[in-house]
């Protein structure tokens, strides 16, 4: 596995998704990562700390420069809990849960997040403005409504399928909406 190539492609994908999602300082970006899928294995079966480290470090460097928070989703064994900075958990009044990820419960990405974040904690729920899914991990439960699929510049990272989501406020009305006749305001 060419880790330098994984890092370079991660950077390319993240910058593209951030541009398309139009995130701003203070927003939250969720990452779902199957390092198993990146290395060509089946999700949850071939976790790689080294791959997790390269991807997390690359993403953190980009997001920290922009003032955007990272939330790293864990696997189903941790009920898809997320690693975030304690400062974010405090700011958003997120409930912290007591668990430490392992390579096979949380995964390589969560382990790397615990290594590279300043004060990492696990939270059970979050509402992010956008996110990146590397390896079909299903991040939708953590992205606010209304979710908008983004087609990243690259469709794969290593052997993993890559998708992304942005979000927008709900449109209540507008050009496509239909209304019943307003008999009170008619005329």
Curated annotation (Swiss-Prot):
InterPro entries attached to this UniProt entry: Antibiotic_NAT-like, DUF436
Pfam families named among the record's database cross-references: DUF436
Gene3D superfamilies listed in its UniProt record: Hypothetical protein TT1679
Signal peptide: none
Family label: Belongs to the UPF0340 family.
Xref: NCBIfam families: TIGR01440 family protein (TIGR01440)
HAMAP family referenced in this protein's UniProt entry, alphabetically: UPF0340
Protein name according to UniProt: UPF0340 protein SSA_1999
